[in-house]
């Protein structure tokens, strides 16, 4: 999902694609314990039928590598993850069946539905997806049903995806997503505004008439897309470093000291060395 969105961003920068109005890159992870499924939805570059045939049904063909080779004079491999064309097949370690629904960004592209129960056999036909991006559904095997549990899924995502360059949102099917309440001064176009109506005074009681108050809610992202080490050291305070240390290493103590690395020559290096 991250690679798919990164590719679309690079195409937009190169002038080969225009984001639709209000576009917000994100990955949705939806657990469904009733149906024993785990779903991943991105609004990235998507795939055509030919691309599904090449990158999904054939092992060791990397879409990221092919993309970088095609645009090697126009872009770099920054933020690209996949290189070997093998990662997708790890899905069959936890799933009896995998389904893909995808729609390419290319003009005139048709949606594609792909399904496989492992092995060498698969089904591919025209799908019904209407938005650009890819949706992958894992039908979990009996040994992996724990991943349909919202809390277990959150634990795994926080461990391995906390600093992905794209916002990742986790939700449970047919349940209310997790929200943060946002100050009205910090409202974004993508936030949800809820009008809250206070109760009227009961008959015979004194009180103010009912009022409307706006409550602004924003979905809670699992990933921190701008972690502390990517910032300039001059922008970071002592409390920032301590809070980040406690969050990442789950240590209530303060580190003895730290070194913020921010090098551009002779090579690019960013990071924070903590000494507990």
Functional labels for PLM-detected ranges:
Residues 1-142, 146-147, 162, 180, ...:
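GHKL (Bergerat-fold) ATPase N-terminal catalytic module, capturing the glycine-rich phosphate-binding loop
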Residues 80, 98-121, 141-145, 151-276:
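GHKL/Bergerat-fold ATPase module in large chromosome/replication-associated machines
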């Amino acid at each position: 999902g991250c690679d798919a969105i990164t590719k679309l961003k690079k195409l937009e920068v190169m002038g080969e694609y225009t984001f639709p109005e209000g576009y917000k890159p994100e990955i949705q992870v939806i657990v469904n314990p009733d149906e024993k499924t785990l779903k991943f939805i991105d609004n990235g570059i998507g795939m055509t039928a030919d691309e599904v045939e090449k990158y999904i049904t054939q092992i060791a063909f990397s879409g990221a590598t092919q993309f970088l080779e095609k645009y090697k004079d126009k872009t770099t491999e920054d933020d690209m993850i996949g290189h070997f064309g093998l990662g997708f097949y790890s899905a069959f370690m936890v799933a009896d069946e995998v389904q893909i629904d995808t729609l390419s960004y290319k003009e005139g592209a048709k949606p594609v539905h792909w399904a496989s129960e492992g092995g060498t056999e698969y089904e591919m036909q025209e799908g019904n997806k209407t938005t650009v991006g890819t949706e992958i559904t894992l039908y979990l095997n009996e040994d992996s049903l724990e991943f349909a549990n919202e809390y277990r899924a959150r634990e795994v995502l926080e461990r391995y995806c906390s600093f992905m360059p794209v916002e990742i949102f986790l939700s449970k099917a047919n349940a209310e997503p997790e929200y943060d309440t946002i100050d009205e001064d910090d409202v974004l176009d993508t936030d949800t505004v809820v009008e809250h109506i206070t109760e009227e005074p009961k008959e015979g009681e004194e009180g103010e008439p009912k009022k409307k108050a706006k409550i602004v809610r924003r979905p809670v992202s699992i990933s921190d897309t701008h972690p502390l080490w990517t910032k300039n050291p001059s922008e970071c305070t002592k409390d920032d470093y301590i809070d980040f240390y406690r969050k990442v290493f789950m240590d209530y103590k303060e580190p003895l000291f730290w070194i913020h690395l921010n090098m551009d020559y002779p090579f690019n290096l960013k990071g924070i060395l903590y000494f507990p």
